[in-house]
Amino acid sequence: MSAAVVTVRGLRRAFGAQQVLDALDLDIADGEFVAMLGLSGSGKSTLLRILAGLDHQADGSVVVPRSRAVVFQNPRLLPWRRALANVTFALADAGPDAPSRTARGRAALDEVGLADKADAWPLSLSGGEAQRVSLARALVREPDLLLLDEPFGALDALTRLKMYRLLHDLWARRHMAVLHVTHDVDEAILLADRVVVLSDGRVSLDRRVDLPFPRSRGDEGFDDLRRVLLAELGVREEVGHDRGR
């Protein structure tokens, strides 16, 4: 196992009387892809915001790499900037001169398959294209840790499948650590090295996904792991239920 790039110990975060994270411990190794599941209100997004440095009100110990980036469900593109300018905006505080920023931005757009959309306005992009620009904006920072907060939740099914393949290829090529927050059990199994479930502000289940890539629903071991994860989430799948395979 590689050295940990994320180490969380005894993390607590409350909002008023509501304890959202309660003495949570978590490690993520260098280059590891971890998917995080949990019911609404379980603390997934709160944890991600803390790791991203967007929430400084928690107690406990958090060690994260300096170079990290976040992709949210909403692409959050600036509508008055073209796609390339949205990507290079992430480098505004990084120090490189303008030509270098432009070259890195174009390379990031090319990496997500949008080299021809550099001059496009955000409102002219499809939902999938806008999310790929958002992903390029994260990648251009060359993060050691990529934090994903349900980035595919607003996309249609076919676009989600394309984004799964893109994300897996980027992760395999860049060898960065990934924490992927999702409500979709199948998505977690398809993408991750490891799946953790949050419940009552703590990790209630931590399971490695020992299935070879590429994965698909119906693979040997897929359904068994799916049932384990659903049970941990309090969902019992009905016998004979057809998921459209």
UniProtKB/Swiss-Prot annotation:
Q: Can you state which reaction this protein catalyses?
A: ATP + H2O + aliphatic sulfonate-[sulfonate-binding protein]Side 1 = ADP + phosphate + aliphatic sulfonateSide 2 + [sulfonate-binding protein]Side 1
Residue span(s) of domain ABC transporter: 6-225
- Per UniProt, ATP binds at 38-45
Q: Which UniProt keywords apply?
A: ATP-binding, Cell membrane, Membrane, Nucleotide-binding, Translocase, Transport
User: GO cellular-component terms in the record?
Assistant: plasma membrane
Q: What is its EC number?
A: 7.6.2.14
Cellular compartment(s): Cell membrane
Q: Is this entry keyworded Transferase? A: no
List GO molecular-function terms, semicolon-separated. Answer: ATP binding; ATP hydrolysis activity
- State the source organism's domain of life: Bacteria
Q: Which Pfam families match?
A: ABC_tran
Its placement in the membrane is given as: Peripheral membrane protein
Gene3D superfamilies in alphabetical order? P-loop containing nucleotide triphosphate hydrolases (3.40.50.300)
Q: State the oligomer form and interacting partners.
A: The complex is composed of two ATP-binding proteins (SsuB), two transmembrane proteins (SsuC) and a solute-binding protein (SsuA).
Chain's role: Part of the ABC transporter complex SsuABC involved in aliphatic sulfonates import. Responsible for energy coupling to the transport system.
Family listed: Belongs to the ABC transporter superfamily. Aliphatic sulfonates importer (TC 3.A.1.17.2) family.
Name by which UniProt lists this protein: Aliphatic sulfonates import ATP-binding protein SsuB
